[in-house]
């Protein structure tokens, strides 16, 4: 049970920071427009530097000889997740099938796993580098494919290459090259300190932003429309937070990869959707309200479901804390 408690404490610590962001925006301590600046600071600067800092300090082909397999594991994960999402979409009405499917498929593959792994093992751990390699293409795929879920409901959009070739992708490639050629030995210590210190603000900043975004998306409605999609939301939470992790755990037991790969895969399967889902849905002319309810309900339920999944996972893949 200690694994459950340890994971629960890590999730609750993250929740506390998220609630602080929720409270700050809800009480108007700062304008909600400030979130746009903080989001840019976190995603375009702090998070890429966090990636670079970990790759510079922790990656080398000697330590991770099979590093190139991580993107392939992600591809396999994405294929299975897409198949599950499309299959489960027939459980809901056709009018909301696109919103249901996209929310199932696009997991919060980078932010929450960073926070969960950091909460469980501290910032200096052997799992962050494989995580960054695992999700190297994930943000690019999200930004280049989300319109496909809505088919003829939207006009064809031009690809935004700034989102596809995003700062996290660039940072991962740069850090990977530095590690492969052992150039980190020639980087001045003060530059590594700067990169590490700025990257360290990414974790709390991301949770503050998540809390603020949830308030803006869920609590503040100009049209005062309070419709709740209880049946659809319950169905979504059961599939996303329970069925997905159990299916992937069964596959892990069948394939028996090493602990690092297995842990990253099960965390990817257990986390809720990315918080940008309501924005994607609205941009595609879908039902933003139900998408917001999917995201928030999954986040709330994950407070208990993630520790439970990690506890069950630990029974088959013992985690060295």
Describe the residue ranges of each PLM region.
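Alpha-helical transmembrane segments of multi-pass small-molecule/ion transporters
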Residues: 1-321
């Amino acid at each position: 049970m200690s694994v459950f408690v340890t994971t629960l404490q890590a999730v609750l610590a993250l929740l506390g920071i998220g609630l602080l962001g929720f409270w700050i925006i809800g009480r108007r301590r700062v304008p909600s427009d400030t979130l746009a600046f903080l989001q840019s600071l976190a995603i375009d600067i702090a998070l890429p530097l966090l990636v670079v800092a970990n790759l510079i300090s922790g990656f080398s082909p000697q330590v991770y000889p099979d590093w190139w397999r991580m993107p392939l594991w992600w591809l396999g994960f994405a294929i299975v997740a897409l198949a599950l999402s499309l299959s489960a979409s027939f459980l809901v009405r056709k009018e909301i099938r696109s919103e249901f499917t996209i929310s199932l498929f696009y997991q919060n593959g980078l932010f929450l796993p960073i926070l969960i792994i950091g909460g469980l093992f501290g910032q200096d751990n052997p799992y962050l580098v494989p995580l960054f390699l695992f999700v190297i293409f994930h943000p690019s795929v999200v930004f280049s494919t989300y319109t496909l879920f809505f088919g003829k409901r939207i006009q064809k959009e031009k690809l935004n290459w700034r989102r596809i070739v995003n700062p996290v992708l660039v940072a991962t490639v740069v850090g990977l090259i530095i590690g492969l050629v052992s150039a980190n030995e020639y980087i001045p210590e003060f530059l590594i300190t700067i990169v590490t210190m700025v990257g360290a603000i990414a974790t709390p900043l991301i949770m503050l932003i998540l809390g603020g975004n949830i308030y803006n998306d869920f609590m503040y409605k100009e049209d005062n429309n309070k419709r709740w999609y209880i049946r659809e939301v319950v169905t979504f939470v059961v599939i996303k937070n329970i069925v997905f992790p159990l299916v992937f755990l069964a596959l892990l037991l069948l394939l028996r990869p090493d602990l690092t790969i297995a842990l990253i895969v099960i965390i990817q399967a257990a986390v809720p959707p990315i918080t940008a889902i309501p924005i994607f849905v609205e941009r595609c002319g879908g039902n933003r309200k139900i998408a917001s309810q999917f995201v928030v309900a999954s986040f709330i339920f994950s407070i208990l479901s993630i520790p439970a999944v990690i506890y069950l996972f630990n029974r088959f893949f013992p985690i060295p804390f």
